[in-house]
Design a protein with these regions (language model features):
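Nucleotide-sugar donor phosphate/pyrophosphate-binding loop at the beta->alpha transition
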Residues: 63-67, 102-105, 112-135, 148
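Short alpha-helical donor nucleotide-sugar binding micro-motif in glycosyltransferases
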Residues: 73, 253-254, 260-263, 269-276, ...
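Conserved acidic donor-binding segment of nucleotide-sugar-dependent glycosyltransferases
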Residues: 326-338, 346-350
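Aromatic "clamp/platform" in nucleotide-sugar-dependent glycosyltransferases that forms part
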Residues: 293
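Carbohydrate-associated surface elements
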Residues: 145, 166
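A conserved mid-protein helix/loop that constitutes part of the nucleotide-sugar donor-binding site
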Residues: 13-21, 193, 197-216, 230-237
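N-terminal strand-loop element at the rim of the active site
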Residues: 5-64, 149, 229-230
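Short hydrophobic beta-strand element within catalytic cores of glycosyltransferases
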Residues: 34, 310-314
Length: 391
């Protein structure tokens, strides 16, 4: 089966990293088109042997990109066109229809109750999205919560399929040696209780709540923020105002191509000067906190659970969709500093001697998600197909 993936950009981000990981587990002949910003993840996908094209789109209204995209689809003779993220879903669905491809799948990676990919959910955004959605066959939601939001928007229920994000579970297994190396690399005190926050440093992630909570806790509590974004300068200023100098580490992006390296490539035996990868950073932490009140899935928290970390969340559909008995290690916490401070204080006094991933993370093994996605492709692709039994 030949599949073209169209995505808005390929800089470092959750949807972009998820696409790269999924491509490594799909038994398809795949090509990728980035409308713009074919950055770090594009290079990583190409290194995996996948053909990547940068369409060079100059902006949301660069209509000249549309005929170029149509030509690519026609020349590739694809069985399925799969679009990712708002702009790519709109242009990709239109281009596929113009190229004569009706088997179009779109994944909705980041739809909240009040925003989509950081943009406010105005009537215009919704109308444009729904107009494009009608040109496709199936819209994939990364969680039941996103599926419910799509249906409330007006997407017919029969056109929505839930395929959760996935991770390579074993790559996130807790590693004591990696923990020691990473804590030394970050200059963390030996007895520090390290609280992590992973994600884009944007206002919606509410990492300010985590800093204000840390300011209420003893001096041995250190915050490690993994990611970058427009709120970083303000978060640095806030940390200084709160008297947290020396107790907050801004480590920048941890590019997922390190933990999602090629088979056989070891990322944890690398030179000590190399920046730690995400599994190493998670091993160095004692708890993971997500004060964001609105998430589409909560992939970073699943990765934290896979590392055996206790996680606190204000919103995490990935965890909320599980039975209570399967949520071991994950606890809901309202998105305010007092609540997070109280919850972290309780965790600080109860650090387990050993860390094991709860069984729940197996629900989000990437191979299972890839099998489910193949069944979506089979339902829309022309010709005889074989249903895949999820692993």
């Amino acid at each position: 089966m030949k599949v073209l993936h169209i995505i808005t950009g390929l800089g470092v981000g959750g949807a972009e990293q998820q696409l790269r990981l999924m491509l490594r587990h799909l038994p398809t002949d795949s090509d990728v088109v980035a409308l713009t910003n074919a950055g770090t993840v594009a290079q990583a996908i190409a290194a995996d042997g996948i053909r990547v094209t940068d369409l060079g789109m100059s902006g949301n209204r660069d209509l000249a990109a549309l005929p170029r995209l149509v030509r690519i689809i026609r020349a590739g003779r694809y069985d399925v066109v799969h679009t990712h993220l708002y702009r790519a879903c709109l242009y990709g669905r239109i281009a596929a229809r113009m190229a004569g491809v009706r088997a179009v799948v779109a994944t909705e990676h980041s739809l909240g109750d009040s925003q989509m990919e950081g943009r406010p959910l105005t009537a215009g955004v919704r109308a444009l999205y729904l107009a494009g959605e009608r040109l496709g066959r199936v819209t994939v939601a990364v969680s039941p919560a996103v599926g419910a939001r799509l249906h409330r928007w007006g997407v017919p229920r029969q056109r929505i399929r839930v395929v959760p994000n996935g991770i390579e579970v074993e790559r996130f297994r807790f590693d004591p040696a990696s923990r020691a190396r990473t804590r030394q690399h970050l200059g963390l005190p030996s007895g520090a209780f390290v609280v992590g926050g992973v994600g884009r440093l944007t206002a919606g992630k509410r990492f300010d709540v985590l800093l204000r909570a840390a300011a209420q806790l003893p001096a041995d509590v250190v915050v490690v923020l993994v990611g970058n974004g427009p709120e970083e300068p303000e978060l640095r200023r806030l940390a200084h105002r709160l008297g947290l100098d020396g107790r907050v580490r801004f480590v920048g992006e941890s590019t997922h191509e390190a933990p999602y390296a090629s088979p056989g490539e070891s990322t944890r035996e690398s030179d000590a000067a190399r920046a730690p990868d995400l599994p190493s950073l998670l091993s160095a932490m004692d708890a993971l906190a997500s004060p964001s009140p609105e998430e589409a899935f909560g992939l970073a928290l699943v990765e934290g659970l896979a590392s055996g970390l206790p996680v606190l969340y204000a919103s995490c559909p990935a965890v909320e969709g599980l039975d209570a008995a399967e949520r071991s290690g994950a606890a809901y916490c309202p998105s305010d500093p007092d609540s997070f401070a109280q919850a972290l204080h309780g965790l600080r006094g109860d650090v387990p001697p050993h860390r094991e991933a709860p069984a729940a993370v197996r629900h989000y093994c990437i191979s299972r998600s890839a099998d489910q996605l193949m069944n979506v492709y089979a339902s829309v692709a022309p010709g005889p197909t074989l249903e895949v039994t999820p692993r």
